[in-house]
Amino acid sequence: RYARILSEKRARQGATYEEANDKMFERNYFGMMMVETGDADAFITGLYTKYSNTIKVAKEVIGIQPQYKHFGTMHILNSKKGTYFLADTLINRHPNAETLIDIAKLSEHTVRFFNHTPVMAMLSYSNFGADTEGSPVSVHEAVEYMQQNYPDLAIDGEMQVNFAMDRKMRDAKYPFTRLKGKDVNTLVFPNLSSANSAYKLLQAMNTEMELIGPIQMGLNKPCLLYTSPS
């Protein structure tokens, strides 16, 4: 039954029943098909499978919510200073402006789901257009789009993380930002290397900090793509 449903779903992507039937012997395909058909409420995977393959299967079987072209992952950090939401920590290696826009929109929705009001900084090594080449340009374009289309959302960038985290320093040097007077609680990183390294560094240096995640954002149905801490 699962093979038939998958082959019909992906018939226009070249899938055949025989290929779909072979895939049902793989735990990721079988487990995600259980969720897709309603035979299971959620699927947890990743401990014994390659993460990149797990992402591929999730997009193929469960799919991305129609209002987005990309999905992402968030980690939540609870510390004495407060609660912080970090994205995208596991999925998109080299996001362009379009991907960063989706990550920002997904983060906004997820932060509100956890009953927090997002105050979002789009991070980079550059501040507010100081560098006109490379990854800061993508972040700058994403911020521009978000500010135009979400006028009530507290979001700004691109900015260095020290300015994001220090309200007084940010307000003194960049008083024009939409974040003036606000404490940032949502950090969107420019790429996977920076986001993944940041949350793992914080976790390693502060044993009193609670780490929650990964939290998948943007898939059609619940699927936890777990990564081994080792």
Task: Outline where the language-model segments fall.
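Contiguous, glycine/small-aliphatic-enriched amphipathic segments in soluble metabolic enzymes
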Residues: 1-47, 103, 108-121, 127, ...
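Short glycine-rich anion-binding loops that position phosphate/pyrophosphate groups of nucleotides
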Residues: 48-51, 57, 128, 192-195
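A glycine- and small-aliphatic-rich helix-loop capping segment at beta-alpha/alpha-beta transitions
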Residues: 50-69, 141-142, 203-212
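A general structural motif
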Residues: 65-70, 77, 98-114, 208
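Short, flexible loop segments at boundaries between secondary-structure elements
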Residues: 72-83, 216-225
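A structural-propensity feature for long, helix-poor, extended segments
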Residues: 77-97
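Active-site-proximal beta-alpha loop/turn segments in soluble metabolic enzymes
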Residues: 85-92, 123-131
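Conserved small/polar residues in nucleotide/adenosyl-binding loops
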Residues: 226-230
